Amino acid sequence: MDNLRPVLYLSMLLVLFLIWQAWNRDYGPQPVAAPGAQEQVMDRDGVPAPPQDVPDAPVSEAVDAPTEVAPAEPDRRRIRVVTDVLDIEIDTRGGDLVRADLPTYPVSLRTPDQPIRLLDERFRQYVAQSGLIHDRVPGVSGEGRAPSHHAIFQAERDEFRLADGQDELRVPLTWTSEDGVQVTKTYTFRRGDFLINVDHAVRNNSDQPWVGRQYRQIRHGSTPSRESWFLYTFTGVAYHDGRYEKLSLEDMAGKPLDKDVQGGWISIIQHYFLTAWVPFEHEINQFYTRVLGTPARPEHIIGMRSEAQTAAPGEETVFTSRFWVGPKEQAALKAIQPGLELTVDYGMLSFLAKPLFWVLDWIHNVVGNWGWAIIILTILIKLVFYKLSETSYRSMAKMRAVQPKMMQLKDRYGDDKQRMNQALMELYKKEKINPLGGCLPILVQIPVFIALYWVLLESVEMRQAPWILWIQDLSVRDPYFILPILMGVTMIAQYKLNPAPMDPIQQKLMMALPFVFTVFFAFFPAGLVLYWFVNNLLSIAQQWYITRNIEKAGKKG
């Protein structure tokens, strides 16, 4: 056991380092990509070719790529939409969502008036696009009959606000072709909701049939990535086609997506937040991915294209869809579409992290504070493993009691390690001691620790959640390092309660570990340090009680 305990602690230290590296990657300064202009592709006659970022039709069904010529840029406007939970900008070019702020989610507690920004057109960073493409009908030219996200729409005013007492806000944008096809693109916002309805109503006022499809896509301009060795929060493309699938931005070029899916959804995931196009469950769409730009400045697109719909002359057809732009709230996401809640990704220990979050959430609903919920969860975990810990601490207490006999064996056999180990095994057998028993608490804590790390890292409910006094955000480090220092003190106390290793080098190593752990924990989220600190306090109390009883029994005997 003397050799195994330091190895376990060093393994734990390695896990801490990997977690710390991942945490630093997520909360360190983010690099900013330089803006890059989209290259315009010319055909042989020097005329601009159709835009590359508009999806093509299936090969089996010919489709005219949109070739409408956008009016002069002065006709392009920004429409602002403000609800109680969203502050949106819509570009009249394409009717795209080019900015999305979440006023109820500030960037940090120090800047409460600066909201999190998800969609952001600057540097081509993050834009939600949608439009229509026209199928070729024999004898009918599709040119200019369907507005892509390059077309210029008209809006009745420049700002829409959800008024007090109003539950729904509709923002209509209109486009009309030269032959009389009128398209009304309508965004519908609801109070307290991050889900936006997006409809394209096609009114065919021409004398020719209209046949076309709707496409929806999210465009993401990559910034230089910073990978960690082991644990990280996934940022990239995710979709659901009956199964939850992830595709990193780096892999999109080599693994393009192209499949027909009923229902499902497509998304780009960020830490704590999500943007996703969510069709209705009965719809069949073709999911696709594209990578544009240059290797140095790639632009990633994930999208979906609907089946064709027809509007005869004088008739109307409507394309519907939904777009989520907001936090990864598991209950809300699960209610929208099956599998959407899986974007809250707890990593390789999801089977353990999910029940931990469920219990934490239940406790929080009772006590109303995430800090106290973590403390109560720690107590419950300790109760679950009480008997296992009791067995381990009894073994360690017995080891401590026979320490003098072990020192006598060391003096007797000196450097003869073979005879020394044989004598120790006989002593353990005689005293009914399991030399590996003291390692069990460490082994039990490691997976729980990692799972709780994922819960704190991925659950937006924990973001900026206060506890008491100076701890106003359990998802970031203690600003004054008080909890890490207290945690280090508890580790020193635990070291004093445990039997000291016989090897002097191992003794020095075990004495140094509390200080090393304190340094690592100083940069971990306060909620995680709180869990470890309370767990150590409970372990010390349990170990002290068991050790005292065994020592009393030894004196009586």
Curated annotation (Swiss-Prot):
One of its GO terms (molecular function) is membrane insertase activity. Residues 34-60 are annotated as: Disordered. Signal peptide: none annotated. One of its GO terms (biological process) is protein insertion into membrane. It is found in: Cell inner membrane. Pfam families: 60KD_IMP, YidC_periplas. Coiled coil: none annotated. GO terms for cellular component: plasma membrane. The chain crosses the membrane at residues 3-23, 366-386, 436-456, 480-500, 514-534. It is a multi-pass membrane protein. Keywords: Cell inner membrane, Cell membrane, Chaperone, Membrane, Protein transport, Transmembrane, Transmembrane helix, Transport. It comes from the Bacteria. InterPro entries: Membr_insert_YidC, Membr_insert_YidC_N, YidC/ALB3/OXA1/COX18, YidC/Oxa/ALB_C, YidC_ALB_C, YidC_periplasmic_sf. CDD domains: 5TM_YidC_Alb3, EcYidC-like_peri. Required for the insertion and/or proper folding and/or complex formation of integral membrane proteins into the membrane. Involved in integration of membrane proteins that insert both dependently and independently of the Sec translocase complex, as well as at least some lipoproteins. Aids folding of multispanning membrane proteins. Belongs to the OXA1/ALB3/YidC family. Type 1 subfamily. Interacts with the Sec translocase complex via SecD. Specifically interacts with transmembrane segments of nascent integral membrane proteins during membrane integration. This is Membrane protein insertase YidC. It comes from Thioalkalivibrio sulfidiphilus (strain HL-EbGR7). The gene is yidC.
